[in-house]
């Protein structure tokens, strides 16, 4: 019997889209997009976060001003209900993905522990 692991992965991706954790994230993001101010702040935060991560990956030090700016923006967006809901939905989906990764990776871990 030949196993096509990619078929299994594609089926898993399809199944994922029906789970409450995925649907919750999808709905939370749709709600966020309807709030122009919150969505604009969210996108600004994402852009700044990406810029700072790239800078760090290139071995550059972040300035105190950059750190303060991203912290202030994070605090502002953290007070917005639509963003809080999105973050909670992301956390729930991330927890599920971590559990799935542990299941999938178990045979590899078993090799090293055996």
From Swiss-Prot:
Signal peptide range: none
Gene3D superfamilies recorded: YheA/YmcA-like
UniProt xrefs under InterPro entries: Com_YlbF (IPR010368), YheA/YmcA-like_dom_sf (IPR023378)
Similarity remark: Belongs to the UPF0342 family.
Protein name: UPF0342 protein LCA_0622
Naturally occurring in which organism (per UniProt): Latilactobacillus sakei subsp. sakei (strain 23K)
